Amino acid sequence: MGFMRVKRTCLFSIILLSESLLGPPIAIAENPNYSTEVFKFKSVSRGKERPVIAQIWVPTNSKGPHPVIVTQHGAGRDGLIFADGEGRTDEYSSRIIKNGIERGFVVAALDAFFENDIQPRDKKKFPNAYRYALDLKKILASDIRFDNGNIFYTGFSFGAAQVGKSFDIQYASDAKPWRAVAAAEPGCNAFPEPIKATFPVLIIKGSESHYYLEPCQHFIKMLRKAGNLVTFLLIKGANHFFSTDGRITRGVAVNGCRFNPLIRMQIGGWRFADGSKATRRLFIDKCFTNEGGSGRNREHLNKVIREVINFFESNRS
């Protein structure tokens, strides 16, 4: 069908249009160790249909069906650009991709901000990207190249918050649940009253994060009380970006409900942890702050990536 020029990255250069079991992809890139496909699909966020773009990397040096990692970017997409030049992801997912391929996983990265000029400061505009991940999982599970009994989910920051939604009762009817999930640096200022899931969760926090530990401790306590298997890892000396050069700066963050996080109740509605009723207005007034964080030498990030992939590997069926 011809060739397509794209912005070159360190991962690929030649793009060939083709078709696969996923439907007509935008592009397929060839590499001695993996092939990759970029494709678009429709999903829903807060009642509105949205376009989503995703890229998958498939190892070619091992036989399938392959286990799959779905990875979700944070608020800043500061990592690799997709092969088509449109979608992109963050540094966390970029390293999950590289290391996941080396360990024999298919890795699928989705861009939840596709065709929207959403910046890290635009937190009130962030979509409900967990639905995007579920729809992507459904697409991947239908492809015979992939092991639909071993599909994993991870994300950083905003992406980690989406991972937390996998314990929300509104998604309990998910026909093919994740094999395991991992949340890297979730903020935990708003989370669902958790149900008991069939899969374990790994939660990783930095001890010096401006998204403080206390609300995540509350979430972990509730997860365990519901009967979930939770592994918690605290990275000493690491900030939100798993770096050692962190400092507090001025910037929009959802970290004001450190000691009284917002909880989406199983019976419906929202309440603060102290039992008081919550509204969107109260959530914005109490939980949104100008206390941001910076410092991105990422000294601890490779350790985090190894822990996540090791966790997934140890939970394969």
Model-inferred region functions:
Residues 203-205:
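Short beta-strand/loop motif that positions the catalytic acidic residue
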Residues 229-317:
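C-terminal catalytic histidine-bearing segment of alpha/beta-hydrolase fold enzymes
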Residues 122-144, 165:
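Alpha/beta-hydrolase active-site loop
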Residues 160-172:
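Short glycine-enriched nucleophile-adjacent loop
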Residues 62-66, 71-117, 209-213:
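Short substrate-entry loop that stabilizes the transition state in hydrolases
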Residues 145-157:
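Alpha/beta-hydrolase fold nucleophile elbow
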Residues 173-188:
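A conserved short beta-strand
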Residues 30-64:
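N-terminal cap/lid segment of alpha/beta-hydrolase-fold proteins
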